[in-house]
């Protein structure tokens, strides 16, 4: 793995220095508008903006702007300093020491090393019930697994404040991508006194204290969340935007209509039926995304119902025409997938499964054969429940897939639509559940860790001791690629999921007066601190 910072060898420690110079907030020659405000769509209402309670991309979008961790990412996904202006690691790569800059909370108080100690302990504490606690355990921080299981006190976590500005982390085993993990929003600090005073209401606009580029001024659930510039942010002089209004709209058609009416400044998902025409009519508003580290798949319940039978799971996967879905339904640059991990992931290239090499006719024939062997026919049709959020494209995809299964397998599929907030909180998966993952960090384990038997987001309820062993062994290796390949091949052979597509290069609409908002980060980690409004 590439080290994100310059490594300088010394006798006992290897200081990693912040070599990135911060660019000017906007290019020379640009005239700024007097009103620095934008309105964006977040896709859904969030369950929480508390870093420890965030669990999906809409919340992470807000989290990156409100709270800043030790490091952040640049527009290409490289790790750059955040609250930590430099750090060092010992010769064994097990002790990291972070040196904090003069950062402030939005109430003017100093961000300290103890804030990180408190926040990371709180994240892993079972009483917090963080849906992303598992993520904090990935880096092998001393005692993290035991704390998460309730077998050790949160105070035993291998983190300490050496002084107000020095935060130290001790790992049980070295992990080559440790610093890459640290830009994730759930590892940002929170303000202890505010939480202790206001409890679960600490994130309300009248109470919240943040350390990111913005803070919250207004939040009307299911209507809008308004952020304003945090004047105490350490890099506030380079933050141009004064206000960001986020809307929780799940329907791409509604988003587009509001964009065309001038009420939203960006439309990332253009409905396929209107896309070609709009791109031709508005060339000055067209921008392109780069292929992000994402993977869209569908969970198959491996523990109960018809999908408990691997023959049924394989039949469902084989019967899907991925090329048709991506070219005729999605029409967003998506690339068909037959495995889990995207090919542009650092240090990893999936083995192509045999069924991916078959032609369409052979796949359907094999699917029908497997379903017959499983005991299903016209007199005993396969009946399934397929759960998706109410996003228009998810419903359209599910309807098309259900049609394929009906025409090719005689399956009777009931599509269960849930509001996004309800869907993301779903605890018990049905036969088929909409899945997908955008990388938390650029390494194959961000996807493969999902499917260990104890995985928080293992909605397939996949339970394979051999898979668990491979992933456990991978944590102690400096180059675990071969184990990752074995694990992914096992997952696909067991067909715990139906991989469908990965994001490719796509085009979207953005108002020509919005600058600094290039969608080029492979992990889709974007920061509104980089955005500005040009005079128009």
Describe the role of every protein-language-model region.
Residues 41-91, 121, 207-210:
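N-terminal lobe/hinge region of extracytoplasmic solute-binding protein
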Residues 85-134, 168, 258, 306:
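Aromatic- and charge-enriched surface segment that lines or borders ligand/interaction sites
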Residues 145, 150-156, 160, 165, ...:
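Gly/Pro-rich hinge or "lid" segments in bacterial periplasmic/extracellular proteins
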Residues 25, 44-60, 83, 131-132, ...:
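A structural "hinge/loop" feature
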Residues 217-228, 245-304, 327, 336:
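Extracellular/periplasmic solute-recognition and catalytic clefts
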Residues 24, 31, 160, 360-361, ...:
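Extracytoplasmic/peripheral linker and loop segments enriched in polar/acidic and small residues
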Residues 113-119, 164-170, 174, 212-213, ...:
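Alpha-helical secondary-structure segments
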Residues 335-373, 390-396:
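Structural transition elements
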